[in-house]
Design a protein with these regions (language model features):
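S-adenosylmethionine/decaboxylated-SAM
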Residues: 2-11, 15-209
């Protein structure tokens, strides 16, 4: 399945990266998927389309995000939520009249899978501790890039690995957010986990040895 952008912003926009990502999900075929860092929901829609093609309606997607504008968050590294393309700005502001980076905006994009999707607004440092990880099979971690946030997110998702699931972390090689790599390296070393650095050092794929 090819990765589609759905006329929105996505952090997996570089050529081939989205397709590579979907191939990773395809190889595992999870029924319960958690994404930390939903952004405009493009990756969420692609994941739902893929899981539907594999399992029909027998899948669940859980998405967690702050759902705040980039200029509202000074302490974190997140993608710019503003469009560079004026046509997209006009479409969402004046035609669709919806903020694509909002719970409502993402729900609109995912309405086809309304019964399969749960969106949670909040800080992963607080919310992840409340999520039952026992049934989650795959985690895509692309939330806060601060060292402490990444470490918190990894620790909270550790049960997924114990149950033979996978955590795929984005931005392992992001030079202006070194806390991502530092947290992943320390977490995998401490817990004696297998960590593959893939897609030209972009993703860190973590699982049990």
């Amino acid at each position: 399945m090819r990765y589609k952008k759905y006329f929105r912003k996505t952090s997996l926009k570089q050529k081939g990266v989205g397709d590579f990502f979907l191939d990773q999900i395809q190889s595992k075929k999870p029924r319960v998927f958690l994404e930390v860092g939903v952004f405009h929901g493009v990756t969420a829609r692609n994941v739902c389309e893929l899981l539907y093609s594999i399992h029909g309606n027998d899948f669940n997607y859980i998405g967690l995000d702050l759902f705040k504008e980039s200029d509202e968050i000074n302490s974190e590294v997140i993608p710019n939520t503003k469009f560079n393309n004026p046509l997209k700005t006009i479409y969402f502001n004046y035609i669709r009249r919806i903020n694509p980076y909002s719970v409502e905006g993402v729900e609109y994009l995912l309405k086809k899978f309304k019964k399969n999707v749960s969106l949670i607004k909040g800080d992963s440092n607080k919310i992840l501790k409340k999520i039952d990880m026992s049934k989650i099979e795959y985690v895509f971690l692309d939330g806060g890039h601060d060292y402490l946030t990444v470490m918190n997110d990894l620790n909270c998702c550790y049960e997924v690995l114990i149950n033979n699931g996978i955590i795929l972390c984005d931005d392992y090689d992001l030079s202006y957010a070194p806390g991502v790599k530092k947290a992943i390296d320390e977490f995998t070393f401490k817990n004696n986990l297998k960590c593959e650095i893939i897609c030209n050092n972009r993703f860190a794929k973590i699982q049990k040895i």
